[in-house]
Amino acid sequence: RVVQQLEGAGHTVDRLHLDAEGFDPVMRGADLAGYARGQSADPAVAHYQARIDAAQQLVFIFPIWWEVMPALLKGFIDKVFTNGWAYKPSKHGVEGRLTHIERAVVVTMMNTPKWAYRWLYGNAVQRALVRGTLRKCGVRKVQWVALSPVRHATDAKRQAWLQQVGAMFGA
């Protein structure tokens, strides 16, 4: 539905559906051997990097499992956000290279109440993805929308969430 809303608002959408595309999230020995140099043995990495290079905005939509993103998305970030492409080492840590991305939006769904996720479980998505990856890689504007709790959400609540996310893109 979010893709339909974005397209309806005039945005061009390049949807990455990692599972449907058969993305392999596993960092194998050959990948690890070239990791520090920003090299990957997986030919799909350059393909995904080119798609991100063409983007102005990134939207991540995923459920939170065991307080973090699913392994498929984590593996995507590990393999695709490489040294020299997404960031480069600097004397102060890293210098982000994805500065062409105007904005990233992270939309998550979980059953844990938002207050518990933040105060009891340490807000892992904020630390790992928003600050620890996207901002570190040069994306200055990152918005996170946590839809919660989903287990008992009514249809009306779910529709309100879709409208909330759509409104972020002028839909």
What is each model feature region?
Residues 83-88, 139-143:
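Short, structured loop/turn "capping" segments at alpha-beta junctions
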Residues 55-56, 101, 139:
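Short, well-ordered alpha-helix to beta-strand connector turns
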Residues 1-85, 152-171:
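N-terminal beta1-alpha1-beta2 submodule of the flavodoxin-like/Rossmannoid cofactor-binding fold
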Residues 88-135:
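Short, glycine-/small-residue-rich phosphate/pyrophosphate-handling segment
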Residues 64, 110-112, 148:
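Residue-level signal for short, function-critical loop segments
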Residues 119-171:
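Glycine-rich phosphate/pyrophosphate-binding loop and the adjoining helix
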Residues 79-83, 107, 136:
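Short hydrophobic alpha-helical module
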Residues 14-16, 59, 105-107, 143-145:
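Hydrophobic/aromatic beta-strand patches that form the interior of the parallel beta-sheet core
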